[in-house]
């Protein structure tokens, strides 16, 4: 085969890549569209004549994959975390103060990389030796869906990096979105064909990325803006600032947002926020705020992460959009713990890209605060552009036939008494698991991903099983068989087998998951894990008295009482024993041994300003020493750790004769024990 054909093919590919880079990344087209199309057709014809020379990174190969049966799962090597939100100047000030507290640098001296917060879908794109190899959705942050074939169809994403010296592995993280003009054109075409339209550009982008047929995705006007780097393997070091890393990505052909800038000091951050907010309607794509990131990578590393978000970044969201509508009715829903929640039934209204017909009224106090009545004209807001809320009533529009909202005194589901404990805002049904609504929600919680993770059993299946009275308690799930499931509506052979396999798989769990799945009020994931780590076995937890329970990290008086009372209820014990009898099992946790030290098993209070540790670090250190950390000084307090400017707690401790330790003494204890 003539060598000139290979050379000609590569020349055409490089030229087309260059044109794509200038068009999609630099927004500076080098040639008319007709010339681009001519070269693309020339390349297609040559590759058709010489199929053995087609490469996976050729511009012609954006759409070539066959339709998929479903999306495979991909585990992110580095979790794709979400961001904490700020909704006001006070929230921004709090964010900056937390940074100052952690790294002891005045926030007005810290440079931030400021970006618009695009309203799209977060994705991860992996390049291996410069070639696009894999792409995934964010998913739950740990696991996403394989959307490689669809990502390859997006025109402003290079299939091959624009460099002769690519990193061995480079993971680009960014937001896929649909520009407003493309969204409008897509809906116009759908209307012309009599097809369903999309509510907003974000939904359109999500639906396009999750098409099983990449050819459909290729017809959708999607774009990417990169915002970070994940996995990176190369002999070359990355730039030392976030901004410079984004500019480096741009040189590789990866598109980044044109509005990104640097700012130092709270006034400059607020000015950027206001500038982007003013430009919001003219940008041509949807945004819902700004993202502010500490620019220096070394400072990012010092600040670190909390469980679900980095400490060095925040999403400063725009005020939610508001609209007026009519309150037609109020329904009262019963939750898993018996909480009675009033739900407003609204005349449908379009707010922030979504049609809203329901909104929570939270509780009876909120109804009184708003002074709301059925028939009122209300102001609806999507808080954070996500959760619909009623924020006010237009009193002058109240009709003569407006009807006062009566909070129920009996459960709307089981007719049990509704009570409100003094000091709590929520009224609750007293029916417990006698109440069908509580039982249903408890079962939904039991099978949920963070509990027993029975992914073949969804909410609709739970509802159908309960309606037919085939299950009453969690243990009944493990008694289901193939014949029973096949009698259900819309239950096929495959679905029945998947459900039974998921149920069987769920029998092997962990003590923490099992505790969380039981749905004990106020026992969340973290508390369940702390209980498992502290006690090691279920029997030890069941036998613990109130004082023993309160020794567990983050378990106070209220949670200890909830736990203790749970095990005093014979029905709860029966449910747990039935689950174990059905084969639910886990490995006992070996409790961590804490070396003997003067602070072990003591109650300690922190006060004042610490200079070497943050408050969270000091608390964690005390817990490693086996202390119970309390928030207030009492006669039961053994030690007070006093930092600078200690106030009333120090005075009270001295009055009660509590031993006072300095921050240095605390660190000294810890250093002695671990060394």
Swiss-Prot record:
Cofactor(s) for this UniProt protein: Mg(2+); Mn(2+)
GO MF: DNA binding; DNA ligase (NAD+) activity; metal ion binding
GO biological process, one term: DNA replication
Sequence ranges assigned to domain BRCT in this UniProt record: 594-675
Active site location: 117
InterPro entries documented for this protein: BRCT_dom, BRCT_dom_sf, DisA/LigA_HHH, DNA_ligase, DNA_ligase_AS, DNA_ligase_CS, DNAligase_adenylation, DNAligase_N
Record-listed NAD(+) binding positions: 33-37, 82-83, 115, 138, 175, 293, 317
Reaction(s) this enzyme catalyzes, per UniProt: NAD(+) + (deoxyribonucleotide)n-3'-hydroxyl + 5'-phospho-(deoxyribonucleotide)m = (deoxyribonucleotide)n+m + AMP + beta-nicotinamide D-nucleotide
A cellular component annotation (GO) from this entry: cytosol
CDD domains: BRCT_DNA_ligase_like (cd17748), LIGANc (cd00114)
EC number assigned by the record: 6.5.1.2
PROSITE patterns given in the database record: BRCT, DNA_LIGASE_N1, DNA_LIGASE_N2
Annotated keywords: DNA damage, DNA repair, DNA replication, Ligase, Magnesium, Manganese, Metal-binding, NAD, Zinc
Positions with a binding annotation for Zn(2+): 411, 414, 429, 435
Cross-referenced SMART domains: BRCT, HhH1, LIGANc
Pfam family for this entry, one: HHH_5
Similarity remark: Belongs to the NAD-dependent DNA ligase family. LigA subfamily.
Annotated PANTHER family: CHROMOSOME TRANSMISSION FIDELITY FACTOR 18 (PTHR23389), DNA LIGASE (PTHR23389:SF9)
Function as written in the Swiss-Prot or TrEMBL entry: DNA ligase that catalyzes the formation of phosphodiester linkages between 5'-phosphoryl and 3'-hydroxyl groups in double-stranded DNA using NAD as a coenzyme and as the energy source for the reaction. It is essential for DNA replication and repair of damaged DNA.
HAMAP family, per the entry: DNA_ligase_A
Protein name: DNA ligase
Native organism: Glaesserella parasuis serovar 5 (strain SH0165)
